[in-house]
Amino acid sequence: MTRQSDRLFKSIFTSMSLSLIVALLSTTIALLSARALVLADPFLRRLIRASLALPFIVPVMIFATGIHQKMIEWGLANKLSGIILVHLVYSLPYCAYLIFDAYQAVGIRHEEQAWLLGAKPYQAFIKVTLPLLSPVLFTALSMAYIVSFSQYFLTLMIGGGQVQTLMIWIFPYLQSNDRTLASNYALLFLGITLIVLAVFNGINYLLKRRYQAIDFY
């Protein structure tokens, strides 16, 4: 029982670490991409936005089967880094759409005003734009975390069962006839997710109080 508990706690830690890394990477990449797209040509902007929908069109099983061979060639199969990479493919579009729309609403006009007042570009971005985008950034962070945390097939296919996450642990019980145990693990999954989202929301609240962010929505 102790060994099983240790494996469970290890799978929880792996899931949370993996999902947090994916969420942070997705949000950062989406933020930088959104800034570039706001300043880009309208045709290029529409083309990139349309291409972001590809992960929603291609079924997960087809994508996982196709990318698995490449992961073996690249030496990323059965490794956490390979799972992070494929999770990014499915979490990044959510972040990109959310942050891009928010960045379009905010624009760079506030940064330009800060430049005129003597602020350096990086100072204007950190102290002006980021506080304005913080609600959407934490929404995107939460969405990416949920997408990664709930992935089963991609994790199983690319991880080869070597990387144990909470979903890999739970799924066999969901398929079994032991509904009581399956329900307990499902509640554990839900509880962990809610706690993490509450932490994200708390950090966002503290930042809003600090920067007195303006709500454009």
Q: Each predicted region: which residue ranges?
A:
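Amphipathic alpha-helical segments that mediate coupling or scaffolding at interfaces
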Residues: M1-T2, S15, A36, A40, ...
